[in-house]
């Protein structure tokens, strides 16, 4: 359940399960009492989970807990962290914990293990910007180590084999934590791609995964493999599963995860009902119990896989029934209706829903756009024709009585009654209602 969690991570795992209301009442009570017992041992009760721990345990109010705190916590209770840093993590004062870690002077032989701990804290508080910086630094470190190996063999021989190996293992674990970061961000393609790139470039990757991942008391081997499994199933197109499962470079990894191979084979053979029994059964249980898997699983991963199969049926069918899909896939009818309707609307797919039936519409989205543009064009042309007619009528009026709109009314009347050919400029100005001082119409 807690994958051997120690230190602050134990409280995080217990608090997570209680927060999502997971488990039976007696289980939850037992977890809560275990959490409170740990808090008393490390002399720290300032955790955001304290209220729910007390509520689920049925123990005394929060204010009475501190009276039981005595002695100094044993280092084994701190999860490899300094006492003050462990308390900061328990209190969710993550930024202060990271600051303290970054401010410490660390022996050269422990620098990568130290960076490993900083990466763990950054993951707990989802400081993905900080993790990006760590990823950049790790790339430079790895490149520097390669150059060092090529140019400085004497120095390499001087350093003990154990130190070199510990550094290599720490760097690989940090890179695995980067995969965890991608998963938490729901970047499933990046998660599995990063891991498979590690496998091809770092021969020790699978050794560290199988033998040296659990030792950091953060994420278990089973949880990490499940992250990769889910990322593969979601990211790789349905049509490419058949090629993927036979990749020779991944043969060793497939041996570590028969569950993934089984799922791929079921999907390749379109045995979706059996696949979803595993997806909603064994895989769902593992994810819901995990601090690192549950958030992305509940937020997107579970439904993305279902939508992937819905889309497969839409692609090969012109007419579908919700009830048929429900019985074929073994998924609740109401869930299918809600998810498939959202898929059609958000994807602007050419399907129309009529009760229990989904029909394919022959007209494409492009054709709908063309039709709309054509209708708009007709309306615009009608407006233009109307304006043209109004302008023509106005022109006819002006041409029929051109002097009606010249100057003032009196001037127009006078000029209209007498021929302008018989007048000179002075005479016209004399007859105008507008004086010279006002700038007469015919002033020279």
From Swiss-Prot:
GO terms under biological process: adaptation of signaling pathway by response to pheromone involved in conjugation with cellular fusion; protein deneddylation; regulation of protein neddylation
Compartments (UniProt record): Cytoplasm; Nucleus
UniProt keywords, alphabetically: Cytoplasm, Nucleus, Signalosome
The keyword Nucleus belongs to this UniProt entry's keyword annotation: yes
Domain of life, source organism: Eukaryota
GO cellular component: COP9 signalosome; cytoplasm; nucleus
Location of the PCI domain: 195-367
Signal peptide: none
Main location: cytoplasm
InterPro entries found in the cross-reference section: PCI_dom, Rpn7/CSN1
Region (Disordered): 419-439
Assembly: Component of a COP9 signalosome-like (CSN) complex, composed of RRI1/CSN5, CSN9, RRI2/CSN10, PCI8/CSN11, CSN12 and CSI1. Interacts with PRT1 and RPG1, 2 subunits of the core complex of translation initiation factor 3 (eIF3).
PANTHER family, per database record: 26S PROTESOME SUBUNIT 6 (PTHR14145), COP9 SIGNALOSOME COMPLEX SUBUNIT 1 (PTHR14145:SF2)
Note: Present with 504 molecules/cell in log phase SD medium.
Function: Component of the COP9 signalosome (CSN) complex that acts as an regulator of the ubiquitin (Ubl) conjugation pathway by mediating the deneddylation of the cullin subunit of SCF-type E3 ubiquitin-protein ligase complexes The CSN complex is involved in the regulation of the mating pheromone response. PCI8 may also be involved in transcriptional and translational control.
Protein name listed in UniProt: Cop9 signalosome complex subunit 11
Species annotation: Saccharomyces cerevisiae (strain ATCC 204508 / S288c) (Baker's yeast)
Gene: PCI8
């Amino acid at each position: 359940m807690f994958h051997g969690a120690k230190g602050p991570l134990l409280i995080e795992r217990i608090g997570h399960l209680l927060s999502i209301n997971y488990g039976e009442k007696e289980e939850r009570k037992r977890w809560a009492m275990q959490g409170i017992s740990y808090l008393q041992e490390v002399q720290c009760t300032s955790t955001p989970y304290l209220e729910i721990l007390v509520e689920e345990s049925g123990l005394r109010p929060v204010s009475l807990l501190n009276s039981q705190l005595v002695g100094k916590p044993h280092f084994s209770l701190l999860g490899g962290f300094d006492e003050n840093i462990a308390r900061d993590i328990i209190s969710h004062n993550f930024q202060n914990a990271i600051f303290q870690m970054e401010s410490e002077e660390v022996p050269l032989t422990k620098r990568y293990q130290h960076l490993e701990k900083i990466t763990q804290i950054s993951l707990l508080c989802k400081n993905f910007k900080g993790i990006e910086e760590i990823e950049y630094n790790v790339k430079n470190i790895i490149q520097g180590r390669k150059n060092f190996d090529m140019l400085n063999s004497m120095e390499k021989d001087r350093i003990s084999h154990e130190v070199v190996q510990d550094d290599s293992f720490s760097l690989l674990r940090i890179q695995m934590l980067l995969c965890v970061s991608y998963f938490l961000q729901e970047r499933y393609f990046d998660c599995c791609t990063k891991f498979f790139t590690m496998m091809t470039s770092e021969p020790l990757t699978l050794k560290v995964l199988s033998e040296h991942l659990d030792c950091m008391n953060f994420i278990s081997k089973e949880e990490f493999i499940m992250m990769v499994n889910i990322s593969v199933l979601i990211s790789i197109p349905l049509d490419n599963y058949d090629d993927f499962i036979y990749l020779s470079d991944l043969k060793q990894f497939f041996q570590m995860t028969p569950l993934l191979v089984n799922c791929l084979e079921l999907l390749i053979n379109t045995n979706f009902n059996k696949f979803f029994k595993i997806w909603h059964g064994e895989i769902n249980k593992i994810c819901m119990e995990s601090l690192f898997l549950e958030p992305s699983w509940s937020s997107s991963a579970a439904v993305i896989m279902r939508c992937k199969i819905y889309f497969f049926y839409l692609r090969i069918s012109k007419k579908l029934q919700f009830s048929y899909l429900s019985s074929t896939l073994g998924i609740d009818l109401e869930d299918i209706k809600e998810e498939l309707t959202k898929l059609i609307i958000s994807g602007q797919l050419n399907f129309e829903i009529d009760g229990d039936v989904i029909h394919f519409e022959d007209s494409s989205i492009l054709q709908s756009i063309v039709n709309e543009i054509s209708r708009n064009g007709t309306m615009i042309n009608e407006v233009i024709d109307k304006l043209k007619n109004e302008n023509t009528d106005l022109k006819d009026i002006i041409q029929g009585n051109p002097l009606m709109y010249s100057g003032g009314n009196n001037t127009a009347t006078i000029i209209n009654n007498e021929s302008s050919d018989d007048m000179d400029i002075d005479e016209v100005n004399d007859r105008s209602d507008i004086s010279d001082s006002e700038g007469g119409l015919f002033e020279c």
